[in-house]
């Protein structure tokens, strides 16, 4: 039997009232595969532990199949958890590790049949008599998954189970997990910071930032219609191009978005989404362009290709800009070209894990002799620099965002490897305005308009 899991305004606070999860509401349908996605420290593992009963819920309600579950002990929730570090007993063989929860559940029963059936399902029959120290990382994770599956739980909770494995093994096990959970039809909540895992595994993806739910939707919808600039920047490889823009909407002229040295002219007649941008006249916005929304002008491409094929015509709704080649990343089947268009990149904070900030020590005059003050100063010098994690009572200082490393160019474009490009070359580009995202200064999406979503073909 699989189960429904519902969270209503769930919060988790630790010492001094610091909230790591803030009023989270989620409904997970029976048999659904939901992925909790976000940067390190966003609270996704804490949510998983609250569902499992390993963390107390500070506020809000957890419902399991519609029944109040806040006070249920972990053993009464009928869930199985798969951990990042495998958590196998080193003095037990794989057979004993898989059968351990069955022996605890029914001490008098023989678990051999269920252990063998689980091993066949995972293809690990030849590993049953080995100890964890004799297994590779991928084999250990398969055994850990077998231990969870053998119980026939009503829900799987997986906390970054693939993060300790190499890339090739991650891809292989990702496919195995997807196939296995669909065959079993068990409700699965999967935590990861890897968007590739989230997009390939989940029926739905819930994006968290600082303990707050940003968006929950299908992988396709989260990519195609990010609710805010954080989701847009966190989802997608390469990362979406985010540029600062200024809306200009004169009554007697064409509507444009200035990017600094160049501008995007919105094609007429204006679409409904673009008409709604008129209210942003004279305001700064954030323009989002994914790498597939910009392409090299076909005329330039044709003259640069070794094939000499005729140039296709530009598509309706494309507008022209130019870019200077600053860097190229050869990927084999494609090339990611970094262009300098004279635009100002927009920075989205908290895309990675927050780190303690080094701050200068504020010295105050203290009472005492000159000798005492010199002794204190000598002690401070011996101790070295101090990392301040908490601030004394008083007005909170303004948050200081750590400067991001400067990347070459301000616009990344996908292209094919047969186009001859060189550093410093001026290249004509075409921007597909239909794929344009516009966010306001708070980071909320205003184009496409949030209350009128385009039709997404399944």
Task: Locate the predicted segments by residue.
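ABC ATPase nucleotide-binding domain
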Residues: 6, 13, 27, 63, ...
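The feature captures the beta-strand-to-loop junction immediately N-terminal to the Walker
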Residues: 37-39
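Helix-to-loop junction immediately C-terminal to a conserved catalytic motif
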Residues: 52
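Conserved post-Walker A/P-loop segment of ABC ATPase nucleotide-binding domains
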Residues: 55-63
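ATP-binding/catalytic-site motifs of ATP-hydrolyzing domains
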Residues: 61, 67, 212
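ABC ATPase nucleotide-binding domains
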Residues: 74-235
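Non-catalytic connector elements of ABC transporters
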Residues: 251-458
């Amino acid at each position: 039997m699989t189960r429904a899991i519902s969270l209503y305004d769930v919060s988790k606070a630790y010492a001094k009232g610091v909230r790591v999860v803030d009023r989270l509401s989620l409904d997970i349908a029976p048999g659904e595969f939901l992925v909790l996605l976000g940067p390190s420290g966003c609270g996704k593992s804490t949510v998983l532990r609250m569902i499992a009963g390993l963390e107390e819920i500070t506020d809000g309600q957890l419902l399991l199949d519609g029944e109040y579950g806040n006070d249920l002990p972990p053993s009464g929730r009928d869930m199985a958890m798969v951990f990042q570090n495998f958590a196998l007993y080193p003095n037990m063989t794989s057979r004993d590790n898989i059968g351990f929860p069955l022996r605890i559940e029914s001490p008098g029963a023989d678990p051999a049949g269920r252990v063998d059936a689980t091993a066949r399902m995972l293809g690990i029959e030849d590993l049953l008599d080995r100890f964890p120290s004799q297994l590779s990382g991928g084999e250990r994770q398969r055994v850990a998954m077998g231990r969870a599956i053998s119980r026939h739980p009503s829900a799987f909770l997986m906390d970054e189970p693939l993060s300790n494995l190499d890339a090739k093994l991650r891809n292989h096990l990702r496919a195995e997990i997807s196939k296995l959970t669909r065959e079993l039809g068990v409700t699965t909540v999967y935590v990861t910071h890897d968007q590739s895992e989230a997009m390939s595994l989940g029926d739905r993806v819930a994006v968290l930032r600082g303990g707050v739910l940003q968006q929950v939707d299908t992988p396709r919808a989260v990519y195609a219609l990010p609710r805010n600039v954080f989701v847009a920047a966190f989802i997608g490889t390469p990362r979406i191009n985010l540029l600062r823009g200024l809306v200009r909407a004169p009554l007697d002229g064409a509507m444009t978005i200035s990017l600094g040295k160049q501008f995007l002219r919105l094609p007429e007649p204006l679409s409904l989404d673009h008409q709604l941008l008129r209210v942003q006249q004279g305001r700064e916005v954030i323009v989002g362009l994914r790498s597939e929304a910009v392409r090299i002008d076909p005329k330039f491409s044709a003259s640069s290709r070794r094939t000499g094929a005729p140039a296709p015509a530009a598509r309706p709704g494309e507008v022209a800009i130019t870019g200077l080649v600053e860097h190229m990343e050869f990927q084999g089947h494609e090339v990611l070209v970094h262009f300098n268009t004279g635009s100002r990149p927009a920075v989205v904070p908290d895309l990675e894990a927050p780190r303690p900030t080094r701050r200068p020590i504020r010295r105050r005059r203290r009472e005492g002799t000159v000798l005492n003050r010199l002794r204190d100063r000598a002690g401070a010098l011996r101790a070295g620099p101090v990392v301040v994690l908490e601030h004394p009572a008083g007005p909170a200082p303004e948050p200081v965002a750590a400067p991001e490393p400067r990347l070459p160019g301000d616009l990344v474009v996908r292209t094919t490897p047969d186009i001859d490009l060189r550093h410093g070359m001026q290249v004509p580009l075409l921007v597909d305005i239909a794929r344009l995202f516009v966010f306001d200064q708070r980071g909320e999406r205003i184009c496409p308009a949030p209350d009128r979503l385009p039709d997404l073909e399944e």
